[in-house]
Amino acid sequence: MESKALLAVALWFCVETRAASVGLPGDFLHPPKLSTQKDILTILANTTLQITCRGQRDLDWLWPNAQRDSEERVLVTECGGGDSIFCKTLTIPRVVGNDTGAYKCSYRDVDIASTVYVYVRDYRSPFIASVSDQHGIVYITENKNKTVVIPCRGSISNLNVSLCARYPEKRFVPDGNRISWDSEIGFTLPSYMISYAGMVFCEAKINDETYQSIMYIVVVVGYRIYDVILSPPHEIELSAGEKLVLNCTARTELNVGLDFTWHSPPSKSHHKKIVNRDVKPFPGTVAKMFLSTLTIESVTKSDQGEYTCVASSGRMIKRNRTFVRVHTKPFIAFGSGMKSLVEATVGSQVRIPVKYLSYPAPDIKWYRNGRPIESNYTMIVGDELTIMEVTERDAGNYTVILTNPISMEKQSHMVSLVVNVPPQIGEKALISPMDSYQYGTMQTLTCTVYANPPLHHIQWYWQLEEACSYRPGQTSPYACKEWRHVEDFQGGNKIEVTKNQYALIEGKNKTVSTLVIQAANVSALYKCEAINKAGRGERVISFHVIRGPEITVQPAAQPTEQESVSLLCTADRNTFENLTWYKLGSQATSVHMGESLTPVCKNLDALWKLNGTMFSNSTNDILIVAFQNASLQDQGDYVCSAQDKKTKKRHCLVKQLIILERMAPMITGNLENQTTTIGETIEVTCPASGNPTPHITWFKDNETLVEDSGIVLRDGNRNLTIRRVRKEDGGLYTCQACNVLGCARAETLFIIEGAQEKTNLEVIILVGTAVIAMFFWLLLVIVLRTVKRANEGELKTGYLSIVMDPDELPLDERCERLPYDASKWEFPRDRLKLGKPLGRGAFGQVIEADAFGIDKTATCKTVAVKMLKEGATHSEHRALMSELKILIHIGHHLNVVNLLGACTKPGGPLMVIVEFCKFGNLSTYLRGKRNEFVPYKSKGARFRQGKDYVGELSVDLKRRLDSITSSQSSASSGFVEEKSLSDVEEEEASEELYKDFLTLEHLICYSFQVAKGMEFLASRKCIHRDLAARNILLSEKNVVKICDFGLARDIYKDPDYVRKGDARLPLKWMAPETIFDRVYTIQSDVWSFGVLLWEIFSLGASPYPGVKIDEEFCRRLKEGTRMRAPDYTTPEMYQTMLDCWHEDPNQRPSFSELVEHLGNLLQANAQQDGKDYIVLPMSETLSMEEDSGLSLPTSPVSCMEEEEVCDPKFHYDNTAGISHYLQNSKRKSRPVSVKTFEDIPLEEPEVKVIPDDSQTDSGMVLASEELKTLEDRNKLSPSFGGMMPSKSRESVASEGSNQTSGYQSGYHSDDTDTTVYSSDEAGLLKMVDAAVHADSGTTLRSPPV
């Protein structure tokens, strides 16, 4: 038996060990065993607590206020012995009251545990402060059915605890029912009992000692939800693949917990993301905000439907919903019901709505007659066009263009607005409503009517004067109930004829209706009535026939009180009798006949009869009413009545008598002292008033001043004028105004400065000499202008923007008809502060200035002001005004020098205000940056290589570049710079720009911007004609601007015009068809753009270096010889130059293609430099192609290693990927290689020195002996003009510059106003002119200087 027992014990031990090692299921495990068998253990403070736990698996201890083994006071150790291999002992030495709580021993991976609650009896700290008290905050609700637990647990189980609340203070004692205290839980009571309190605490008494728990702040938790708002609030439209974001915002009362739930359409893909968070409320709001965001990164058609956001606080639920519509792709279309014609009456409000179906919402732009419309105080632009008070000027064609911002699809619709104007009669505003006509005379009555649309009809009516009511004081004093047609003139005046004349004047329909009265016999009223669909207009004419009495006032028309006044009524004594005076008093206005007032003559009995004195002469009877010492009560309306001897009919005349109140003299304002010089004129006015009119007397130094030679008194002595003042005219002058009521005085001091006046003889001699000199000077000017002037039909178009078609209007008339909106462009001269001159020309100048308030973004802006010099002629003034109008016509673009304003009002010089580019022209800038050029700048190693590369430039190369550019000209604008632009900019804030290195990226960026600007000018149908680096200005942030496009010509118009004399043209930049056939097109500008690229990538070198501009040069250029690659270019850029230099203009790329190509090249360079993108100083966004077909050299070192690629003489092959823009080009073939001017050795030309002020870069050097040869060869060569749609007759010798635009110097010498040439240049001009003459058979005149 003993052995069996031992075997059983061993077997149990193995099973237990196996179960522990492999782990038994939870159903087979027994809870761990604790060393104490009690559920509650009570120990004293400062003793040691030790509990051992044994079990069948790995064990862990948990104790109050701690997480596992995180507290250093608590010691958990492995224990041995006993009947279990898994054993842990928890030991806490010197326990305190806060150690009271549940101690739990559990298996590590199974939720099976044993717990003992330990009281550490500490009478000094009977309440436990544990971490589970949530920092002393108790959350409650005001629900009566809810209870709240204040967690003031005790270290002693049988405490007598009460709850204290404040404020106000209140105590709660356990009642064994709803209010209780449990040492393991805390104090429990209904929450509403302490909802008023701010804080609570538990209190207990032990041995007459009172102990308190920690303070608990009472926080009342709310439930109210004010609103739930969805954003966007309206129906949402998206296209497939777009991102959907719905924000659901809930506003609640404070201390509310909120749960969000979203209800959305079922979707196949699980791609919805919901994020909930609290939102910080706005300051001052008593509300809490919660936000739930639903996001779908890429919506599909299945995501379409209703989305509902539900917010719940437990007791309250609110929701909001929206509908999401998903389109398969963006679209745009006009809806049905769009009108094409809208009619409105002048003065009314007009609305032109736009109905469309689109996703996304389109960009809406309105245009009126092709010009964009912006919102202002009269027009509101948006989804509908609203014109507040339509006028005749608002009529026209309105076009709305809708643009889909994603697909960029455009839809347009035009609406014609017709403004109808009711008939307006012009004479109503000009003629008094009561007119008098002599008896028996023929009279003509006229109505001039303006109306739109034309009148339906215009009719004349009449009525006898006595048949109409009389309303004194009214604008139309007569009112007639019935009107008779003029054809029924029985009882009235006989009508001889009526006729209507129609005309269309300035877009207005004008109708003149005439009524001819054969004899004025009867006083009547005539009415002309005009009617059209917009309304009606009428004019009533009082045709008052005079053959009766006349009234006059003596002695004055407006007498003053206390003067003797007489009213005289004069009548023909053979016709009239019984003359009587009446006064029209207040009682007359109360007499009625029916409903209308009666005429005066029908109501004489109601008037106040006056006594008068009768006088007679051979023809007239005169009845006089005299007022001695007239008073204000005497004024009023007086009626003179006379009876016809034959008909006994009474005729009445009304006269209003006005008596002015007496007023003592008064001088308003003070006379100011005046200081002048001898020989000038002094004028002073004495502003005196009074009744009777005061008599004015002037005194000088208290002596009466009388009129004398040079002293003039006018306007009743009010105005004093002293001409040709002398020294003795100085002194104290007194103005005295007197009438019967007194006098008033005012004084002024005249101070005369300067030397004593010369004698009259000396004055006569000086005046005579001046007159003779003026005569000879005018004669000389007339002679010179006759010699120099072109004939009358010519205008100096060299500085105009557009040359018009000669088959239409003359150029000057066409330019003058261009609009100039003074309200938009006029700028006050007093807000313009002129500074230093920037350039000057033969008749004009450019001045730097500060404009105050010309730009809304800045108080003061630096601008450039173009203005004429003193003595400019009328034609020059008209030319500058024409350029101003054309600059407005061209419009605004970032890469052109834009118009800012103008000063055109009389009283000062004509000024054209344009943008100021502080860094000067691009050619000068590039030459100044040669020593600072590095191809790449982004990486440190490459940057250092770039500096080394620049440093290793050969001295010979730099000397050659300096030699090439030493004779560079300034520009073709007609203005010679006062000093070099580099000197000017050193004085300005250019240090920031010049201190940076110049990179290949900069050069490509400059090229790209010029192409953008030329693309804009081409879109405006303008040709530049002088595109070169000297005409490109550099502004802030590396923005380049094209100037001198004032030289541009309108492509719609014929650019042919003939100039006299010799002038310089920039031959090095001109296309062959321009040189030989004078054909100027956009494609010839593309050739010039290629030369400009060469200038940029040679850092400002002069084109065709070392090449003599002679007959051989012209021949080789025509045969296809081109310039070598510049020293700093890439293969791609040189290929672009060759594309621009194609001999067939139609095969050259357009500027739009160049923009795309250079944009790709710029992006590729930026990526090669380590950038993902490049920020361009442009207003438009550049879209880059991934594969631009570009292969740039990786660094200057690689460029030097691959000498065959970087060699300027290298001939580039026609590879397919070399230029992306050629994929859609008209080009069918391209030369495999290009001959350059360096392929054939050239003899060094003889350098001819030309004065600096007339030096140019045009390269026009040709020996006179070569003229004949080139002329003969040109006759045999095909003409370039056959390739072009139009052909210019302009001489190559015509001016190639705009003389009023830009800051650069032109081809004229400012001192002599003539052009200075070398003999070679003059020869070339004559040679080319002769060649074209032989080719075209056209006789050319020499252009003016």
From Swiss-Prot:
Subcellular location as annotated: Cell junction; Endoplasmic reticulum; Cell membrane
Binding locations of ATP: L838, G839, R840, G841, A842, F843, G844, Q845, V846, K866
Annotated Ig-like C2-type domain residues: 46-111, 143-209, 226-325, 330-416, 423-542, 549-656, 665-751
Outcome after substituting Y1173F: Loss of interaction with SHB
Residues linked to a glycan: 46, 98, 145, 160, 247, 320, 376, 397, 509, 521, 578, 611, 617, 629, 673, 702, 719
CDD domains according to UniProt: Ig, PTKc_VEGFR2
UniProt-reported outcome of changing S1188A: Strongly reduces internalization and down-regulation of the activated receptor
Task of the protein: Tyrosine-protein kinase that acts as a cell-surface receptor for VEGFA, VEGFC and VEGFD. Plays an essential role in the regulation of angiogenesis, vascular development, vascular permeability, and embryonic hematopoiesis. Promotes proliferation, survival, migration and differentiation of endothelial cells. Promotes reorganization of the actin cytoskeleton. Isoforms lacking a transmembrane domain, such as isoform 2, may function as decoy receptors for VEGFA, VEGFC and/or VEGFD.
Subunit structure: Homodimer in the presence of bound dimeric VEGFA, VEGFC or VEGFD ligands; monomeric in the absence of bound ligands. Can also form heterodimers with FLT1/VEGFR1 and KDR/VEGFR2. Interacts (tyrosine phosphorylated) with LFYN, NCK1, PLCG1. Interacts (tyrosine-phosphorylated active form preferentially) with DAB2IP (via C2 domain and active form preferentially); the interaction occurs at the late phase of VEGFA response and inhibits KDR/VEGFR2 activity. Interacts with SHBSH2D2A/TSAD, GRB2, MYOF, CBL and PDCD6.
Protein name stated in the entry: Vascular endothelial growth factor receptor 2
Source organism per UniProt: Mus musculus (Mouse)
Annotated gene: Kdr
